[in-house]
Curated annotation (Swiss-Prot):
Main localization category: mitochondrion
Residues with the N6-succinyllysine modification: K12, K78
Its job: Component of the ubiquinol-cytochrome c oxidoreductase, a multisubunit transmembrane complex that is part of the mitochondrial electron transport chain which drives oxidative phosphorylation.
Modified residues (N-acetylalanine): A2
Protein name in the entry: Cytochrome b-c1 complex subunit 7
Biological process, per Gene Ontology: mitochondrial electron transport, ubiquinol to cytochrome c
Organism field: Pongo abelii (Sumatran orangutan)
Family, per entry: Belongs to the UQCRB/QCR7 family.
Residues with N6-acetyllysine modification: K12, K19, K78, K83, K96
Top-level lineage group: Eukaryota
Record localization: Mitochondrion inner membrane
GO cellular component, one term: mitochondrial inner membrane
Subunit structure as annotated in this protein's UniProt entry: Component of the ubiquinol-cytochrome c oxidoreductase (cytochrome b-c1 complex, complex III, CIII), a multisubunit enzyme composed of 11 subunits. The complex is composed of 3 respiratory subunits cytochrome b, cytochrome c1 and Rieske protein UQCRFS1, 2 core protein subunits UQCRC1/QCR1 and UQCRC2/QCR2, and 6 low-molecular weight protein subunits UQCRH/QCR6, UQCRB/QCR7, UQCRQ/QCR8, UQCR10/QCR9, UQCR11/QCR10 and subunit 9, the cleavage product of Rieske protein UQCRFS1.
Length: 111
């Protein structure tokens, strides 16, 4: 029982650190999501290309709005900030698929 409490306490502590970092990074104040800020290497570019049109358009809207706010040295009103609890990693499944396919191609190339 004591072990479960220790795991629960460390999980809450780690979640608190994640929330703090999410807010400290500042991208949420511009309305961006975490996946909007990922460095675009070849795998990420391919994953973005595979996004459904509505997700791609939402991403482009957030990025363009963030650029506009940044140029004006402004941030969104607090009620429009992206919240940690509402974050969805929309690019992750597509990125995992692209990486899996690339690794599979590399394995085939070795044979």
């Amino acid at each position: 029982m004591a072990g479960k409490q220790a795991v629960s306490a460390s999980g809450k502590w780690l979640d608190g650190i994640r929330k703090w970092y999410y807010n400290a990074a500042g991208f949420n104040k511009l309305g961006l999501m975490r996946d909007d800020t990922i460095y675009e290497d070849e795998d990420v570019k391919e994953a973005i290309r595979r996004l459904p049109e509505n997700l791609y358009n939402d991403r482009m809207f957030r990025i363009k709005r963030a650029l506009d706010l940044s140029l004006k040295h402004q941030i969104l009103p607090k009620e429009q900030w992206t919240k940690y609890e509402e974050e969805n990693f929309y690019l992750e499944p597509y990125l995992k698929e692209v990486i899996r396919e690339r690794k599979e191609r590399e394995e085939w190339a070795k044979k």
